[in-house]
């Protein structure tokens, strides 16, 4: 035993076995489930040494029901798991779950070793080598708690008795399983697992979960919460069922789906602008779901080559549509800062393309473009063009979302705005931010497959298109080359496609939420003026010069709609309206003394800080930490340029080394190691960032 703060920590398997006698743990299952779970919260973590030629774990720390253990050799950890399997009579239908915060790291180090001892019977990957969970035949299951909290371990354990300790271990020190740990290092290891245990226990208590009912992800938690309201309302269930899409409609909808509009005025890029301001929508995505009309009823297919006049008529009559459109001879209007056609939404090559602006198409002789009727309204105001038709598409009626769906949204907004500091505040805020994601989930997703061998890890990926339509001949050999069995040789049937949508929120609601937010942002860009708009990102727009009184007219309409829909929150003697465009710095004439951007997700400013009453340098550069970005600018935003190089961009770069299992004898005891990840200081070079990001995974280790 070893002491860590107020804890007695086991250092051997017999010590753990003896202490487990003090814990009584039964099994639980879902009401309609057959699988049982040991009703204990368990957590796991490792610390590693890694070099250019070698990498291994030198600590294996875990917490079972509040009892912490730190072991130094993999074989001891394996024996500990075997003891737990025997003690709790685990098997494939009776499981014990261990949570790992950012499980991809531990997975890569240990999966070959674990598979050598036990059969991997189930796993779900969100990307190559990134499991949401993985399960063995002996009943041991690992889950990624990062997806459960959607925040770093430090933030997830805030307020816990044993929160993650400040700072990181010095990863440059070469440690082995035989290296004695200082008290500080030991405490660091312990807090990583006991703190996570406390955070999950808190989550279970707040939401009345047990180990069988706790969802895998935060989004799943939100879905369960909304379902408690929605599934009791048979009328709402019928509305959602009617919105199920057939295979052709689903493919068009997936192609039309897009995120936030993040872009900068190409005429203003690379220059520093004085005296700027910003508007920011209040809860942009949830506001659309509360205030706007959404797809309802059974969608119907439009005729082939539907004319633009007919498409416009749908909009005038209060309907919406999604389509693959052909646009003939189009060109961005002079002075328009926001080319609304993303190159990723064009099918095939844009014929006669006249130019790209940070991934946006400026014009062309002709192109097939996926868009919905909201994006069409942006397009027709942004471009000059000769003709447009819908080669294929479908339409639908619009109406307000059902009250049973809107109620959890407005309830969360009320708590977020009026009950800050209450126990429900953080969950309501997270729920409000996740409701869009709950609707925007593809029911047919990319599928990642991993085959674990003694020699290494083999990965493959099937796109949602391959799953829906069957693997095309052009891709068949690529899948065969992995050595894995080829799947999805035949397209899905309409019945199979319908089944994927049965228990999900309508995908059209997620699609419509984001496109309505893009349309509202477009309206604000027009109000502040094309010549003044600088940079915008999903729900905010930065612009040059004085504040725009015209925005007040826009907000008056939003406030009136809030009153109509019962979405007004009373906060003291004030009323709060969701969806209004708020002045980011209302107390002063100019919120930004200086503003400069290069492209999407790359800007710096001198923004007003009301706490200090002064302007302060700020930076947002994708792939660079906030502090490191500010330091690199050396007090001058003009240093944000295409030649910017940052020695220390914050976080670590991960370099994957695929290795066979080997038994090594360079430690006091023989031990097995396999593949590993090398952690390197992360640098940033503006000139090569895009190329490097395509070939090397850049991850902030939290």
Predicted segments with their positions:
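N-terminal accessory regions of nucleic-acid-interacting proteins
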Residues: 1-42, 46, 260
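Conserved acidic
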Residues: 34-37, 41, 52-100, 107-702
């Amino acid at each position: 035993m070893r002491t860590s703060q107020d804890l007695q920590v086991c250092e051997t398997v017999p010590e753990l076995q003896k202490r487990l006698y003090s814990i009584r743990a039964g099994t639980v299952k879902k009401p309609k489930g057959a699988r049982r779970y040991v009703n204990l919260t368990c957590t796991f973590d490792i610390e590693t040494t890694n070099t250019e030629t070698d990498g291994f774990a030198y600590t294996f720390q875990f917490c079972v029901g509040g009892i912490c253990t730190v072991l130094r050799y993999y074989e001891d950890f394996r024996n500990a798991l075997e003891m737990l399997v025997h003690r709790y009579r685990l098997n494939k239908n009776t499981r014990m779950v261990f949570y790992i915060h950012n499980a991809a790291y531990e997975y890569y180090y240990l999966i070959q070793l674990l598979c050598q001892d036990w059969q991997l019977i189930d796993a779900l990957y969100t990307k190559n080598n990134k499991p949401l969970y993985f399960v063995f035949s002996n009943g041991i299951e690992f889950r990624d708690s990062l997806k459960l909290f959607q925040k770093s371990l430090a933030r997830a354990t805030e307020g816990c008795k044993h929160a993650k300790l400040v700072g990181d271990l010095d990863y440059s020190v070469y440690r082995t399983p035989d290296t004695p740990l200082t008290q500080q290092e030991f405490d660091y290891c312990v807090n990583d697992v006991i703190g996570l245990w406390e955070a999950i226990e808190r989550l279970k208590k707040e939401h009345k979960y047990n180990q069988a009912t706790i969802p895998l992800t935060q989004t799943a938690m939100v879905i369960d919460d909304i379902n408690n309201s929605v599934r009791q309302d048979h009328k709402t269930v019928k509305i959602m069922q009617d919105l199920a899409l057939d295979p052709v409609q689903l493919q068009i909808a997936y192609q039309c789906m897009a995120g936030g509009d993040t872009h900068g005025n190409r005429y203003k890029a690379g220059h520093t602008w004085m005296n700027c301001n910003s508007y920011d929508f209040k809860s942009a995505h949830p506001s659309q779901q509360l205030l706007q009309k959404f797809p309802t009823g059974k969608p119907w297919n439009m005729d082939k080559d539907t004319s633009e006049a007919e498409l416009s008529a749908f909009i005038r009559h209060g309907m919406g549509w999604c389509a693959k459109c052909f646009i003939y001879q189009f060109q961005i209007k002079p002075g328009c800062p926001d080319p609304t056609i993303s190159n990723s939404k064009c099918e095939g090559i844009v014929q006669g393309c006249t130019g790209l602006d940070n991934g946006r198409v400026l014009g062309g002789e002709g192109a097939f473009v996926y868009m919905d009727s909201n994006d069409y309204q942006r397009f027709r105001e942004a471009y000059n063009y000769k003709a447009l038709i819908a080669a294929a598409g479908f339409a639908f009626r619009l109406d307000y979302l059902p009250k049973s769906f809107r109620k959890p949204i407005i309830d969360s907004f009320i708590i977020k705005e009026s009950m800050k500091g209450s126990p429900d505040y953080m969950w309501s805020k997270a729920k409000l931010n996740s409701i869009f994601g709950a609707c925007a989930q593809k029911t047919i997703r990319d599928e990642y497959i991993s085959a674990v061998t003694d020699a290494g890890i083999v990965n493959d990926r099937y796109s949602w298109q391959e799953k829906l339509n069957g693997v095309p001949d052009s891709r068949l050999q690529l899948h065969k080359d992995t050595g894995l069995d080829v799947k999805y040789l035949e397209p899905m049937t309409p019945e199979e496609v319908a089944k994927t949508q049965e228990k999900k929120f309508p995908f059209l609601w997620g699609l419509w939420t984001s496109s309505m937010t893009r349309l509202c942002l477009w309206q604000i860009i027009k109000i502040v003026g094309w010549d003044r708009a600088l940079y915008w990102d999903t729900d905010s727009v930065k612009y040059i010069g004085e504040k725009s009184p015209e925005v007040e007219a826009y907000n008056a309409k939003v406030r009136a709609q809030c009153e109509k829909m019962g979405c007004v929150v009373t906060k003291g003697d004030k009323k709060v309206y969701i969806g209004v465009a708020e002045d980011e710095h209302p107390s002063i004439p100019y919120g930004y003394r200086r503003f400069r951007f290069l492209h999407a997700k790359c800007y710096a400013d001198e923004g007003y800080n009301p706490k200090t009453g002064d302007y302060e340098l700020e930076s947002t550069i994708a792939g660079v930490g906030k502090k490191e970005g500010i330091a690199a600018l050396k007090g001058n935003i003009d240093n944000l340029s295409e030649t910017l190089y940052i020695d220390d961009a914050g976080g670590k770069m991960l370099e994957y080394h695929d290795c066979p299992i080997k038994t090594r004898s360079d430690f006091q005891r023989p031990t097995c190691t396999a593949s590993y990840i090398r952690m390197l200081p992360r640098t940033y070079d503006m000139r090569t960032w895009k190329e490097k990001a395509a070939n090397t995974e850049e991850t902030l280790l939290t």
